[in-house]
């Protein structure tokens, strides 16, 4: 699972 998803 991805905890942090940066919005580019």
Swiss-Prot record:
The keyword Secreted applies. It is found in: Secreted. GO terms for biological process: neuropeptide signaling pathway. The modification Leucine amide is found at residue 8. In larvae, expressed in the brain and ring gland but not in the midgut or the thoracic perisympathetic organs (tPSO) and abdominal perisympathetic organs (aPSO) (at protein level). In adults, expressed in the brain, corpora cardiaca, corpora allata and thoracic-abdominal ganglion (at protein level). Keywords: Amidation, Neuropeptide, Secreted. One of its GO terms (cellular component) is extracellular region. Belongs to the pyrokinin family. Mediates visceral muscle contractile activity (myotropic activity). This is HUG-Pyrokinin. It comes from Delia radicum.
